């Protein structure tokens, strides 16, 4: 009985520490990674912009659903291993820049991804910058100390490289 109480006290202390540390971390963060692909900016942009085809090259997606809107803006829902997330396309400059924003309000996190496509001598620099906000203190702790705030960007860029037959290593 005494051992069980000690174990319970340790577990509760760990949970309390995780929540306290999460609460002390800033809600907002910015993370950015980039790669160079030996393709044109237009070709890469077309691949990234074709949201419904993303499951053919992103293993984290089961399907993407394009959502009809009344005001002609682009909205889509990605269905992955951890559920569904709805996004809005908020800026679209073909071959140059694209911004998507999480449209769901109840996830415990929100933010934008800004895609920049810059022509280089040997191809195109693809940079993704995440401006995120994590309201859930547990998610905040996990994203900072367990997953890493740039891990989703890195996985995305690696998958994009593989789509074009290139082995890439995302850099800050």
Residue ranges and their predicted role:
Residues 52-86, 95-97:
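Short beta-edge strand/loop motif at the mouth of beta-sheet-based domains
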Residues 2-68:
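Hydrophobic ligand-binding cavity/cleft-lining segments
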Residues 88-90, 101-162, 166, 170-172:
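Beta-strand/loop substructures that line and gate deep hydrophobic ligand-binding cavities in soluble
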Residues 34-38, 77, 88, 116-118:
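Generic structural detector for well-ordered beta-strands
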Residues 43-48, 54, 76, 89, ...:
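Hydrophobic pocket/interface hotspot
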Residues 25, 77-79, 104-106:
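Short Gly/Pro-enriched turn/cap motifs at secondary-structure boundaries
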Residues 37, 80-82, 93, 106, ...:
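A generic beta-sheet turn/junction motif
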Residues 28-36, 73-75, 84, 97, ...:
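Intrinsic-disorder/low-complexity, polar/charged segments enriched in Ser/Thr/Lys/Arg/Asp/Glu/Gln
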């Amino acid at each position: 009985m005494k051992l069980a109480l000690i174990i319970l006290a340790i577990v509760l202390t760990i949970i309390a520490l995780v929540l306290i540390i999460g609460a002390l971390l800033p809600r907002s963060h910015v993370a950015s990674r980039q790669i160079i692909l030996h393709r044109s900016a237009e070709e890469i942009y077309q691949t990234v912009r074709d949201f419904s085809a993303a499951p053919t090259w992103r293993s984290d997606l089961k399907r993407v659903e394009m959502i009809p809107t009344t005001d002609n803006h682009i909205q889509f829902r990605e269905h992955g291993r951890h559920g569904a997330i709805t996004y809005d396309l908020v800026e679209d400059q073909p071959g140059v820049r694209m911004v998507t924003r999480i449209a769901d309000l109840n996830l415990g996190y929100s933010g934008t991804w800004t895609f920049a496509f810059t022509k280089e001598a040997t191809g195109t620099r693809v940079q993704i910058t995440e401006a995120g906000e994590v309201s859930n203190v547990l998610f905040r702790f996990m994203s900072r100390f367990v997953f890493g705030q740039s891990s989703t960007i890195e996985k995305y860029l690696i998958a994009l490289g593989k789509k074009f037959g290139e082995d890439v290593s995302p850099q800050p």
